[in-house]
Amino acid sequence: MIRYFTAGESHGPALSAIIEGMPAGVAVSREEIDLQLRRRQQGYGRGGRMKIEQDSAEVLSGIRFGKTIGSPIALVIRNRDWENWTDKMAQFESHEATTEKITIPRPGHADLAGRIKYGFNDIRPVIDRSSARETAARVAAGSLARTFLCQLGIEIGSRISSIGPVTDTGSDKTISALLEKGAECLAGAADRSEVRMLGKKAEEDAIAAIDLAKERGDTLGGIIEIYITGVPVGLGSYVQHDRRLDSQLAAAVMAIQAIKGVEIGPAFENARKPGSEVHDALHLVKGEGVERPTNRSGGIEGSMSSGETIHIRAAMKPISSMQSPLQSFDLATLQPVLSRFERSDTCAVPAAGVVAEAVVAPVIANALFEKFGGDHLEEIRNRLNHYREAVRSAFSG
């Protein structure tokens, strides 16, 4: 079972991650990890921090000669901006007397609840750990599980279907054609857009909307569509609540900063339709197996993978740090004041799509481990291939 922990503050020396449970024998490269980190930094509407950081992962353990060795993998991502924060974020030398305390909580952030929960007299520690900067470590960790899945024929990708008022409906035929080649192909097509949208007109409108929001000192959220192809039927389980694949995927995506809603397939649209227009019919195709003319279940039926593309939609709220501040109050004086602005993005929806790809990878990998077990890539691959062949043969007629 893959599990990982991250550590580090947004303006501290570095972010780090420890990944446990990766099987031995998985070919990995620093270039692939860094590619995912670069993808996370992309997107129109990002703030000044992205001009400072050039994220790259340093591997400290768990990999030898380009392959995993089954032991915990430790990764470090240095924060270049640390040199500007050595006094404010010093670990041991005390600069408390000369460091300005942050006492005005920003609406929509972790500031107020975090300050009350942990008893700080300064909101800075809350700001720095709750920051979405932490997702760089999750992307690095997730890239390892993603690489493992790719070597088993399972791919993950995402696109952005809306930013603010702009919706990219996308051509179903275009999306289907890309997914036929694998979700990585769809991700590559999305990456060619500054906002990771597939439609050119939608891309132009989204960029204009981001520009307008920035001009007004405002921010924009949006909707992310995540796709996972090549997943065999039967991952997850209906037997216990904590083994349900859909709940595990939803939890992983909901744990991304600013994500406020998740659905599997067009779930909320399905809720407004009769069952006859929602459920996917089953067709037995001789020599091929079971096919569904639609995939409104989002690739999960009865909390298990159906064998179709897994489709997850996530709603990201607008970023809470705005240059046109909302009403707040000062914790030191208890007087009403306008909220303070912390350097931030106008829109980070495209980057959040990359983070979503990363966090679902360990979930699918763990569902594979639960089904097939194994400590080495080849052991798992052989068991998976045997299972796939058995499923195909059962319906070949």
UniProtKB/Swiss-Prot annotation:
The gene is aroC. It catalyses: 5-O-(1-carboxyvinyl)-3-phosphoshikimate = chorismate + phosphate. GO terms for molecular function: chorismate synthase activity; FMN binding. PANTHER family: CHORISMATE SYNTHASE. This reaction introduces a second double bond into the aromatic ring system. NADP(+) binds at R40, R46. GO terms for cellular component: cytosol. InterPro entries: Chorismate_synth (IPR000453), Chorismate_synth_AroC_sf (IPR035904), Chorismate_synthase_CS (IPR020541). Pathway: Metabolic intermediate biosynthesis; chorismate biosynthesis; chorismate from D-erythrose 4-phosphate and phosphoenolpyruvate: step 7/7. Pfam families: Chorismate_synt. The keyword Amino-acid biosynthesis applies. Its cofactor is FMNH2. It comes from Chlorobium phaeovibrioides (strain DSM 265 / 1930). GO terms for biological process: amino acid biosynthetic process; aromatic amino acid family biosynthetic process; chorismate biosynthetic process. This is Chorismate synthase. It is an enzyme of class 4 (lyase). Homotetramer. It comes from the Bacteria. Keywords: Amino-acid biosynthesis, Aromatic amino acid biosynthesis, FAD, Flavoprotein, FMN, Lyase, NADP. Belongs to the chorismate synthase family. Reduced FMN (FMNH(2)). Its EC number is 4.2.3.5. FMN binds at R129, S130, S131, Q257, A258, G302, K317, P318, I319, S320, S321, R343.
